[in-house]
Amino acid sequence: MSNMSKGNLKTDKNTDYLFRYFMNEDKLNEQLRTELDREMDEKIKANKNFRLDTRIGTERNKSVTKKPNINGGNVNNANGANNNSSEETELPSNSENSDKPNVDFNDSDSDSSNQDSVTASDGFNGSKSPYKNKINAVPGSILPVNTFGQFPGLNQNFQQDSGQNFNQSPVARNTYTAPQPALGDRLIGDIEKYIETPEEKRARAREAYAKLEELVENYSVQLSRTYTIDDDPNELEAEYQMQKDKRSKKTQVQFYKQILLNIVCGAEYLNETYDPFKIKLKDWSKQMASDMDNYTEVLGEIYEKYRDRGGKMAPEIKLLFMIIMSGVTFHLSQKLFGQGGLSDVVGNNPNVINQLLGGLMKGGMGNMLGGDEPVEAKVTPKNNKSILEAIKKYNNKGTSESKSESRSDYKSESVNSVSTEKSDKQSETIKKITEANEIVAKERERRLMAEQRAEMEAQLRRQSEQHAAEMEQMRNQYLNSIGQLSTTRPVDNYSQPSINDNYVNTPTKINNSVNLVLSDATKKPRFLNNQKVANSPIISNKPLNTRDIGFGDFFGNETDMNKESSKKSGRLNIGGFDNLDSLDSTNSIDSEDDDIVSDINDFFASNKPTKSPKQPVSATKSTTKKRPNSITRSATRSVGRKKGTETSDLITPRKPKIIDL
């Protein structure tokens, strides 16, 4: 501690930097820790009979030194009072009897002994240990600045480097700041404000919906979607705010345009009246009026930039600006068009508006309404002064000005006549063009209908041809099946053994040898030796007489059945084959085929041929009629009706000998 009192405090550069600029209390305690621990160890070694639960007490009359007065005897205490007298500080290292034990172990836990012991161990003026100050610190309090007075060297370094006296600090000492309430505690009182009842929510929805309806009805605003009163009030309010901002921007931009145009008109008028700088600004306002749409984006950006700067404009100020702008506009009209104003000029001379509009159109919009420059624009005077003079002359009803008025009236009448003639010609040409367009439209419609009709006819023709081909195919299949059934003959393939004979029923097939069929090409085929095969109508080229085998009765019955069915359906069926519509149904064909097969099987079972193979099949040729020709003819007749000119190819009778097996 003697080194500390002399100002020989050993600190590194970084620690000095922290002390100098930040007064870091933790760094200071860390720097003093080793010195304080060393002194504490020396005191414990000097006392042999010590107890750990006692406090260290010292006698104030021993090892008392005077604290040096660095600041001229004016040192601040911890309480902020000035002490001119030297204060006695107990330093164990500077005591006279430092070798003897100079501490007493006191069991009392009084505040005075505690304060004395801490003062002796720390070396601070009446303050506790820096460790205890750190632990028992009151919120908001700081380390007393006058503690640096105990270290003259350190205090001098601070004062020399920074030029400030840290013993006189303006910071309040031992201040206490009350803790702030938590966020939840503050919200508990206003919790009802954050809870919205269903009635309040519906009320907000009704209010926002009413505002939206007012915007739509008064200003024809187009909403982003269709809203109802049952929608979310937050969405309704957001939509209303968006539409309101859009409309506010639009109206404000229009107001800016009006202000800009009035400024330009005023500048042009002043330049024409005084002309101090010889600047040619004639018809500048007309050019600005024609190009005003080009300034919409820039004026919108200006509005977006400054709309939140000055806050929302009061409605009174806005109304005042509107009245001022109206007055300025009226003043300009009175100045330009005389005492009567624009209404009197228009009433007395209607062509003034046409002339002004012609001048505007000539500036930048002349080619938008027809391409050619209007006649009124050609008659327009060259400058504004001539317009003012003409208007003043017209307003003055002097005798000398009557001639000029009559001339102007004559010119206006001539201009009106030319314009009426042009309008009549234009109306006639428009009428002719409309009539020609109507004729072209009718002709186009007629051609389109004709093309559609041709396409429909071609489609129907293709469908009819396809249907006829299907019917022809079905007819051929049906005739082939009938021919195959008619040419089938029962063959005695099985020999009937006697009842008494022990005969195994094994079939003895006739003509089952391959050699009987595949004979020599130069000789007559061997299967012709079989009498039954030789007498067949296919081999012998003899017509098949259906009456001999009972087919006539069968086809007669079929004809009667078809007639009865045709009477029920209202159609005529001839010969059992004319009703070709019945061939479209596969179920009817299958049922008829099953009936035919069953009848033929019954016939073969009842009428077995005799054993004499020489008997011809068509024995009763003279007593029967040729049915196949009539059957084929009747079948082709109905198909020929549908195919028209193709009937001649189908009328040829189909002979049984050419039926393909």
Curated annotation (Swiss-Prot):
Pfam families recorded: DUF5767
Polar residues bias spans: 118-130, 607-622
Bias kind Basic and acidic residues: ranges: 400-412
Keywords assigned by UniProt, alphabetized: Coiled coil
Protein name: Uncharacterized protein R449
Disordered as annotated region, ranges: 55-132, 396-429, 558-577, 604-661
Coiled-coil annotated spans: 23-51, 198-226, 435-485
InterPro entries from the UniProt entry: DUF5767
Superkingdom assignment: Viruses
